[in-house]
Amino acid sequence: MISRKYFGTDGVRGEVGKEPMTPQWVMHLAWAVGSVLCDNGFAGEKVLVGKDTRLSGYLFENAIIAGLSAAGMEVHMLGVMPTPGIAYFTRTFNAAAGVVVSASHNVFSDNGVKVFARGGYKLPDSAEQQIEAYLDKPMTLVAPAKMGKVYRVAEARGRYIEFCKNSIPLNLPFHRLKLVLDCAHGATYAVAPDVFRELGAQVIVTNAAPNGCNINDGCGSTHPEALQQRVCQEQADIGIAFDGDGDRVIMVDQRGRIIDGDAILYIIAKYRAFKGEQLNTIVGTLMTNLGLEQSLRKMGITLHRAQVGDRYVLEQLQLLQARVGGENSGHIICLDRNSTGDGIIAALQVLAAILEMETTLEDLIADLALTTQVLKSVTVVERDAVINSAAVQTAIQNAEEKLRNRGRLLLRPSGTEPKIRVMAEGDDETLLNDVVNELIATIKEQEKTHA
């Protein structure tokens, strides 16, 4: 993997007001993106810009427009739009790139920037390295006559709604479904409710009143507890929770149980087989549940594991010429529908499976035996130093010895937050918790040493 200074697994992120998330730095980043596009033969072409509902989005949206215009790129503004919607417009506008202002599932005080290449695919590491090289150069402006113009895309939300609706067969009996949506006060708030209502479902909408500061605040795909309760209270069939920018989805069955990304992948695999579109390969990650791998194998499907991060899932999908992949966190990519993870599209695949196969969400995963996973995170600034410390390395060896032949251990730095994630998987939940808690305690001790 190519070493990058600023880009993580999903673009650039940070706390607003601290580098890199200052207006000056973000403008420089946008100029760098535009400059790389010019170097690669896209001078003066269209670049799409969209954002989620964070208050700081106004600030960074304008900084990006200024930077792109300074590099001579033509800018088309989408306003608030789910990240996969921006990928869709990048593809259908045949734009040189799409730029997203979002920190996805992070707290509102964070923000970030991610970039789609032509075709709506996330940038490869090599392109991000080219952009970072420009960030080390002083910003310059093209000649005044070559500066980029700025336009607003008309009816963008309505166009994306129609795209989502057309991703599944028409005339399915959605009127049979009672849904509860959790829009995380994020970018799906003005899109997802209309998608499901226009298809005919009875829709109860929660967390769809963004004020700029409440995105992901105790809601959405990373906090589904309230959705679980609401589904049971409303006697709904299904709950659907998106994250702040709409590229993740987690679902809830009628009994209030979580249906995570691994279970969603299994349902999509079943649905495609039912329709005669058998999948030979599905791409997961190092975090993908062993139970899913075993269940897919029984269906004649091979699970390939990518590094954690939907960008790496996409790379493997393209390399293997496969169609479906994702992460247990809810990033689900259906490359024959959209070019990136799309929460609405993934949810529609599951609902179409229920309606066409005349079954329930509960029954679709009845034969999926997931193994127990214990996942915990700890905030660490000097992540590499802590992970490579002798104490943590010894603790890892001890943990692996305890789990020998009884499970597996994964410890990794987050690609989107200053955290270290520790995951243990196996059949003995008590053992898994003990192993993870001991490792977390050692990491916290070493964090103090390296602070």
From Swiss-Prot:
<comment type="similarity">
    <text>Belongs to the phosphohexose mutase family.</text>
</comment>
<dbReference type="InterPro" id="IPR005844">
    <property type="entry name" value="A-D-PHexomutase_a/b/a-I"/>
</dbReference>
<dbReference type="GO" id="GO:0009252">
    <property type="term" value="P:peptidoglycan biosynthetic process"/>
</dbReference>
<dbReference type="InterPro" id="IPR016055">
    <property type="entry name" value="A-D-PHexomutase_a/b/a-I/II/III"/>
</dbReference>
<dbReference type="GO" id="GO:0005975">
    <property type="term" value="P:carbohydrate metabolic process"/>
</dbReference>
<dbReference type="GO" id="GO:0005829">
    <property type="term" value="C:cytosol"/>
</dbReference>
<dbReference type="InterPro" id="IPR006352">
    <property type="entry name" value="GlmM_bact"/>
</dbReference>
<dbReference type="InterPro" id="IPR050060">
    <property type="entry name" value="Phosphoglucosamine_mutase"/>
</dbReference>
<keyword id="KW-0597">Phosphoprotein</keyword>
<protein>
    <recommendedName>
        <fullName>Phosphoglucosamine mutase</fullName>
        <ecNumber>5.4.2.10</ecNumber>
    </recommendedName>
</protein>
<keyword id="KW-0479">Metal-binding</keyword>
<dbReference type="GO" id="GO:0000287">
    <property type="term" value="F:magnesium ion binding"/>
</dbReference>
<dbReference type="InterPro" id="IPR005846">
    <property type="entry name" value="A-D-PHexomutase_a/b/a-III"/>
</dbReference>
<dbReference type="Pfam" id="PF02879">
    <property type="entry name" value="PGM_PMM_II"/>
</dbReference>
<dbReference type="Pfam" id="PF00408">
    <property type="entry name" value="PGM_PMM_IV"/>
</dbReference>
<dbReference type="InterPro" id="IPR036900">
    <property type="entry name" value="A-D-PHexomutase_C_sf"/>
</dbReference>
<dbReference type="InterPro" id="IPR005843">
    <property type="entry name" value="A-D-PHexomutase_C"/>
</dbReference>
<comment type="function">
    <text>Catalyzes the conversion of glucosamine-6-phosphate to glucosamine-1-phosphate.</text>
</comment>
<feature type="binding site">
    <location>
        <position position="245"/>
    </location>
    <ligand>
        <name>Mg(2+)</name>
    </ligand>
</feature>
<dbReference type="GO" id="GO:0006048">
    <property type="term" value="P:UDP-N-acetylglucosamine biosynthetic process"/>
</dbReference>
<keyword id="KW-0413">Isomerase</keyword>
<dbReference type="Pfam" id="PF02880">
    <property type="entry name" value="PGM_PMM_III"/>
</dbReference>
<feature type="binding site">
    <location>
        <position position="243"/>
    </location>
    <ligand>
        <name>Mg(2+)</name>
    </ligand>
</feature>
<keyword id="KW-0460">Magnesium</keyword>
<dbReference type="InterPro" id="IPR005841">
    <property type="entry name" value="Alpha-D-phosphohexomutase_SF"/>
</dbReference>
<dbReference type="GO" id="GO:0008966">
    <property type="term" value="F:phosphoglucosamine mutase activity"/>
</dbReference>
<feature type="modified residue" description="Phosphoserine">
    <location>
        <position position="104"/>
    </location>
</feature>
<feature type="binding site" description="via phosphate group">
    <location>
        <position position="104"/>
    </location>
    <ligand>
        <name>Mg(2+)</name>
    </ligand>
</feature>
<dbReference type="GO" id="GO:0004615">
    <property type="term" value="F:phosphomannomutase activity"/>
</dbReference>
<dbReference type="InterPro" id="IPR005845">
    <property type="entry name" value="A-D-PHexomutase_a/b/a-II"/>
</dbReference>
<feature type="active site" description="Phosphoserine intermediate">
    <location>
        <position position="104"/>
    </location>
</feature>
<dbReference type="Pfam" id="PF02878">
    <property type="entry name" value="PGM_PMM_I"/>
</dbReference>
<feature type="binding site">
    <location>
        <position position="247"/>
    </location>
    <ligand>
        <name>Mg(2+)</name>
    </ligand>
</feature>
